[in-house]
Amino acid sequence: MLIEAVRLTLFPAMMAFAASSDLLTMTIANRVSLILIAGFAALALLSGLGGAEVLSHVEAAAVVLGVAFFCFACGWIGGGDAKLAAVTALWLGFGNLFSYLVYASLLGGALTLLIVQFRTIPLPRLLAGREWAERLHSQGAGVPYGVALAAAALLVYPQTEWMTAVGL
C-alpha cells in the first residue's frame, strides 16, 4: 500500500514543485533531482525491478543528461532544466522517452511563444510589483523551460510501469 502511494504521488508532486519553482524563481533546486533519484532507487528496490531494467533506466538518464549538458553548455537551457530532464528520463526509461521528448518540445515551444507574446504587451496591473511576473515579463529573461519539462512528464507518467502497476 505504501509503495502504491509513492508511485501515485512522489513523481507528480516533485514535477509540480519543479514547475512552480522554475516559474516563480527561474531555478530548480538540486534537492528535486536528489529526491527523485532516491525515490526511483527505493521504488525500484521495493518493486523488484530487475537489474537489467534498472540499468536501462539509468542509461536513459545518462543519454538525456549528456544531451542536456551540451544544451546547457551552449546556453540554450539552464542547469536545473538539464538535471530535471535527466532525472525524468530515469523514471520514464527508454520506453517512454520519445513521447516525453516530443511533448517537452511541443509544450516548450508553445510556452516560449506565449512568453514572447506576453512580453510584447504592458505588464497587467494585477501583476505589477510581483517579482516573478516582472522577471517573466523582462525582455532579457529566459524561459522557465522546467514548466514544459514537468508538464510533459506528467502527460507521459500515466503510461509508465510505475502507474500501470497500480492498476488505475
Which stretches of residues belong to each language-model region?
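A membrane-topology feature that recognizes alpha-helical transmembrane segments
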Residues: 1-168
